[in-house]
Regions:
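Bacterial Sec-dependent N-terminal signal peptides
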Residues: 1-35
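Noncatalytic modules at the cell exterior or secretory-pathway interfaces
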Residues: 175-176, 263-278, 391-406
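Solvent-exposed, flexible loop/coil segments flanking beta-strands in beta-rich domains
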Residues: 127-196, 283-353, 413-465
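Short acidic/polar inter-strand loop motif in beta-rich domains
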Residues: 118-122, 279-283, 404-413
Length: 465
């Protein structure tokens, strides 16, 4: 049976209809919770943005308080909806890593709705995160600091430098961790650090030679070593322990479980920042960065090993890395893994013509193991991606890397206009030349490695509770 409401008085019908509409509208509004800064937006900003966007850091403005964020609301909306910020080039639908910084669609929608509603503040709170002023790991045993501040010219140009800091310890020792602390956090954009080690009679004066050289001035790695006088006295290369630290703004140093990693080092050596990128500045500035060494009382049980595919690595690039002007080209490199390994970290590397990067493993059984996919290469953000658990790669597997390079006028990062032929054949360190590398940090596989989590490891150090 249907019930029909009829109104003899038109005015009564209109009033009833308006009241009914108001009730329905009010019901919808009450069910939709207001998006506020303190409840919804602050946790997103503090987790993904504040570590860089705070006083003295690399971000161009602060994003800490409600007023900070409200003033930049339109900018935040634009860069988050486009995916430009927070910077995380790797495709998280392809592989997952520790320390990911990206926004989910739900978080992007919250930001959109908040800005659209006029940026309401909401109730007081939450408290802004607290960041340690110096070490994030504890009290170091030794601090190795640049002897003199390095002058960064105020000419609005990026600089890619190589810096050495020689040192002499009391004796040969073991290291648990190495931590880089930038002296100028606003301009220090990324650093890849290594340790050069000298045996007692290999080099009499480890303190000779210049401390700094511009990568653009030396070209090859060999020229760099010779200019900085890093070679042994007989002209041979010293022992290099690679990738003992890596730095990007806002990135927390990676801590590994007990028994994993660590280093043996000689008493005489040098910290080699083989790739330190200073961002542009309109005014002269200085940097006097330092490195914290944390000793260990026992030798490392499972020190990391490193290899690289492609440029200066164990595998050839096909076709040879030569990119004619006005072309978009794909290059491939591959290498066989002969024994089972536990893969820990990967680092894709290209220069300014890079367009996309893909790396994966094909196992002997024909399975594919995804490593990393970067759909839109960004030279400014070259992470060392650490897997959440060690990744077992069976012996007999083949690791593939595919890189696409764009040497056209449509590439906004192309260093030349009009485009020129760009080569990567000589292993040049100049950013205007090219490289195509995949760097792997790994261990020989042990039973159960794939079950070892690399997340949320608490360092057992002095000064850490």
């Amino acid at each position: 049976m249907k019930t029909h409401l009829k109104f003899k008085n038109t005015n009564i019908g209109i009033v009833f209809t308006l009241l009914l509409t108001a009730v329905i509208a009010d019901g919808c509004t009450s069910n939709k919770k207001q998006i506020t800064f303190s409840e919804h937006i602050a946790p997103i900003i503090h987790k993904n943005c504040t570590s860089c966007h705070r006083p003295g850091e690399a971000g161009p403005f602060d994003l800490i308080s409600f007023n900070d964020v409200r003033k930049k609301a339109k900018t935040i909306l634009k860069v988050t909806q486009s995916g430009l910020m927070p910077p995380w080039p790797a495709d998280t639908s392809y592989q997952r890593y520790i320390g990911e910084r990206y926004l989910t669609q739900v978080e992007k929608q919250l930001i959109f709705d908040w800005v659209d509603a006029g940026c309401p503040e909401g109730p007081p709170g939450p408290e802004a995160p607290v960041f340690p002023a110096g070490s994030q790991l504890g009290v170091p045993d030794v601090i190795i600091k640049m002897e003199e501040p390095y002058l960064i010219q105020g000419d609005n140009k990026d600089r890619f430098m190589v810096i050495k800091i020689p040192y002499e310890l009391e004796r040969d020792t073991f290291l648990k961790f190495v931590e880089f602390v930038p002296g100028n956090r606003r301009l220090s954009h990324h650093v890849n650090g290594h340790i050069i080690q000298y045996s007692i009679n290999d080099k009499q004066n480890i303190f000779e030679g210049p401390r700094v050289v511009n990568r653009e001035d030396v070209g090859t790695l060999d020229s760099c070593y010779r200019f900085l006088k890093l070679l042994n006295d007989d002209g041979t290369y010293p022992l290099l322990t690679p990738s003992v630290f890596n730095y990007l703004p806002g990135v927390t140093p990676q801590i590994y479980p007990s028994g994993v990693g660590g280093y043996r080092i000689k008493k005489k050596g040098a910290i080699l920042m083989r790739d330190i990128h200073y961002g542009p500045t309109p005014k002269n500035a200085t940097d006097q960065s330092y490195v914290n060494l944390f000793f260990d009382s026992v030798p490392p049980k499972r020190p990391f090993m490193e290899t690289q595919l492609g440029t200066l690595g164990i595998s050839e690039i096909v076709p040879p890395l030569l990119i004619p002007p006005d072309t978009i080209m794909k290059f491939v490199t591959k290498a066989i893994i002969y024994n089972d390994i536990s893969l820990v970290t990967i680092n894709p590397h290209m220069h300014l013509l890079g367009k996309s990067f893909l790396a994966y493993v094909i196992t002997p059984s024909g399975d594919t193991i995804p490593l990393v996919r970067i759909k839109e290469w960004d030279f400014r953000w070259q992470y060392f991606y650490t897997f959440r658990n060690m990744m077992r790669i069976p012996g007999g597997s083949v690791i593939f890397a595919e890189g696409v390079f764009d040497n056209t006028v449509n590439n906004p990062n192309n260093p030349f206009s009009p485009p020129r032929e760009i080569t990567g054949l000589g292993g040049s360190m100049r950013t205007t030349d090219e490289m195509f590398q995949l760097i792997l940090t790994f261990l020989p596989y042990q039973q159960g490695d794939e079950n070892i989590s690399l997340e949320n490891v608490t360092p057992q150090m002095k000064g850490i509770q």
